[in-house]
């Protein structure tokens, strides 16, 4: 996105004529943003000023046709006021949200967020959802699935706002938080009241929010099922009137086996209105057999047929074309040393990176080890309290930490544009998990690299991954860098070994990553 024009640069473009009025010569710095007000849905005057109240470019005089074209192009790239953003969105070409019958206030809101053109999944799903059809949408990571279901929900809610209009279920707390924040941002021009219901926070405060009849509930299935079972009828009565239900990352929500969320999902869906009384939307990056089976379900009487679309879900399209997939062969005993060297090379030393492990134990140990070796690192895994998970993720988003060590709780849905490197410290057991992990980089057309540390026992796993993604991994190369030689050079192995032993001692002594003794609460008898 091009930088915003400054008031000084704008003033230089203004053509000064001898008969200019006093109003036209007024300093642009003295202009004030319009007051917030709410009018009809179709009126462009109902939009408030953006946080940086620079003047509208519409006051600039036309010098020539070429100058006007340049100014118009800059205006399209740099929306200043929400009213201007609305005009940009409505005057765009056919490949726009306007062409999808999206409400003007939503077009303006999306434009202020620099979302001007719909992606393939958005073009396919938004019109059909607005028609009232149930939907199954499959598209690779980073393709804009959240907006594909958020925009229709907000538009249909605005037509008849009442109680709890929609419930969005998602498998992880971090993804739920991200969806919650995105809905708040898109619905900023309206009086939308979303609520976040996830584990790790006080149930009593959540029960009060649920009883307050919010408009949209974003939840993890386990915590919402807890409220349905224990919080009382009055608290969850509003869920009985829900009109739209979304299962985001549906493949994970519906997968059977150990650790399955399916029982909690069934508890939630059985309490909500039946399929004939609600609109159900499923979105996923990997269409599993469980999700595909829903296509052949009998049509609900009185409802239009289910709309099913698969965009970029074939093997060759499961990872972005701008992603470079590489591997490094490592001995089992020196895996930590290779990771340390990889993160410290000339091309990677400044990159924002996510390092994935298979277990929380590995993530905890690796964070301590990398911190001891001088890396700015934080972690994200299920053993951490929710408040710490939120703060660690916020630190990583703000670049206060350069490296995030995480389990697969961070592999789904999280959109952190600054991430340009993903490292699989341990090869995932499921090829679909690899797809979700590497999808944290190279998002929305950006470039990125995924490096997998491969041991002698991981060959079959790598072959399965290559078959899943439809491409071969190439050996990691960096000009002037020999990872193996750097690992063997000097006392690096001793330093890494000492850091690992120190980290293991901290864990055994019950200390946190900063070396502080954890205070365990004693049970009251």
From Swiss-Prot:
UniProt keyword annotations, A-Z: ATP-binding, Helicase, Hydrolase, Nucleotide-binding, Nucleus, Ribosome biogenesis, RNA-binding, rRNA processing
Residue interval(s) of motif DEAD box: 248-251
InterPro entries named among the record's database cross-references: DEAD/DEAH_box_helicase_dom, DEAD_box_RNA_helicase, Helicase_ATP-bd, Helicase_C-like, P-loop_NTPase, RNA-helicase_DEAD-box_CS, RNA_helicase_DEAD_Q_motif
Notes concerning its domains: The Q motif is unique to and characteristic of the DEAD box family of RNA helicases and controls ATP binding and hydrolysis.
A biological-process GO annotation: rRNA processing
Family: Belongs to the DEAD box helicase family. DDX49/DBP8 subfamily.
GO annotation, cellular component aspect: nucleolus; nucleus
Domain Helicase ATP-binding intervals: 126-305
Annotated segments matching region Disordered: 1-76
Organism from which the protein derives: Emericella nidulans (strain FGSC A4 / ATCC 38163 / CBS 112.46 / NRRL 194 / M139) (Aspergillus nidulans)
Catalytic activity: ATP + H2O = ADP + phosphate + H(+)
Biological function: ATP-binding RNA helicase involved in 40S ribosomal subunit biogenesis and is required for the normal formation of 18S rRNAs through pre-rRNA processing at A0, A1 and A2 sites. Required for vegetative growth.
A GO molecular function held by the record: RNA helicase activity
Protein's name in the database: ATP-dependent RNA helicase dbp8
Parts of the chain that traverse the membrane: none
Binding site for ATP: 139-146
Enzyme type, top EC level: hydrolase
Composition-biased stretches (Polar residues): 1-29
UniProt superkingdom: Eukaryota
Gene that produces this protein: dbp8
EC numbers: 3.6.4.13
Motif annotated as Q motif, chain positions: 95-123
Principal location: nucleus
Compartments where located: Nucleus, Nucleolus
Ranges for domain Helicase C-terminal: 337-484
């Amino acid at each position: 996105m091009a930088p915003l024009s400054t008031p000084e640069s704008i003033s230089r473009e203004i053509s000064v004529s001898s008969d200019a009025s006093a109003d036209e010569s007024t300093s642009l710095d003295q202009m004030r943003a319009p007051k917030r007000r709410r009018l009809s849905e179709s009126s462009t005057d109902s939009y408030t000023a953006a946080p940086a109240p620079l003047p509208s470019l519409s006051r600039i005089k036309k010098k020539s046709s070429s100058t006007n074209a340049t100014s118009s192009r800059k205006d399209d790239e740099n929306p200043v006021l929400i009213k201007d953003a609305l005009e940009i969105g409505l005057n765009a070409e056919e490949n726009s949200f306007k062409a999808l019958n999206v409400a003007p206030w939503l077009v303006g809101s999306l434009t202020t967020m620099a979302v001007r053109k719909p992606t393939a999944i958005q073009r396919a799903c938004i019109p059909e959802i607005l028609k009232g059809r149930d939907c199954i949408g499959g598209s690779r990571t980073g393709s804009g699935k959240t907006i594909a279901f958020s925009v229709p929900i907000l538009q249909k809610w605005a037509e008849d706002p009442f109680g709890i209009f929609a419930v969005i279920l998602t498998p992880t707390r971090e993804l739920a938080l991200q969806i919650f924040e995105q809905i708040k941002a898109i619905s900023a021009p309206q009086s939308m009241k979303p609520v976040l219901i996830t584990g790790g926070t006080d149930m009593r405060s959540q029960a009060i929010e649920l009883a307050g009849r919010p408009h949209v509930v974003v939840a993890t299935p386990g915590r919402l099922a807890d409220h349905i079972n224990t919080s009382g009828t009055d608290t969850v009565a509003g869920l009985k009137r829900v009109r739209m239900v979304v299962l985001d990352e549906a493949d994970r929500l519906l997968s059977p086996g150990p650790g399955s969320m399916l029982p909690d999902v069934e508890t939630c869906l059985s309490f909500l209105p039946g399929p004939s009384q609600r609109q159900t939307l499923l979105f996923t990056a990997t269409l599993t057999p469980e999700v595909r089976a829903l296509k052949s379900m009998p049509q609900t009487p009185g409802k239009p047929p289910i709309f099913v679309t698969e965009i970029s879900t074939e093997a060759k399209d499961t990872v972005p074309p701008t992603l470079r997939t590489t591997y490094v062969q490592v001995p089992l005993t020196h895996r930590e040393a290779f990771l340390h060297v990889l993160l410290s090379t000339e091309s990677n030393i400044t990159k924002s990176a996510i390092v994935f492990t298979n277990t929380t134990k590995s993530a905890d140990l690796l964070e301590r080890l990398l911190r001891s070796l001088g890396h700015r690192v934080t972690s994200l895994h299920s053993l951490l309290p929710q408040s710490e998970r939120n703060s660690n993720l916020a630190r990583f988003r703000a670049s206060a930490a350069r490296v995030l060590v995480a389990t697969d709780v961070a592999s789904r849905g999280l959109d952190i544009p600054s991430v340009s490197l993903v490292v699989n410290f341990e090869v995932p057991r499921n090829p679909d998990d690899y797809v979700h992990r590497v999808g944290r980089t190279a998002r929305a057309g950006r470039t990125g690299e995924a490096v997998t540390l491969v041991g002698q026992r991981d060959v079959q796993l790598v072959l399965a991954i290559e078959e899943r993604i439809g491409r071969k991994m190439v050996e990691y190369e960096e000009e002037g860098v020999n990872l193996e030689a750097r690992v063997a050079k000097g006392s690096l192995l001793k330093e890494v070994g000492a850091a690992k032993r120190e980290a293991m001692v901290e864990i055994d002594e019950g200390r946190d990553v900063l070396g502080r003794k954890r205070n365990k609460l004693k049970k009251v008898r």
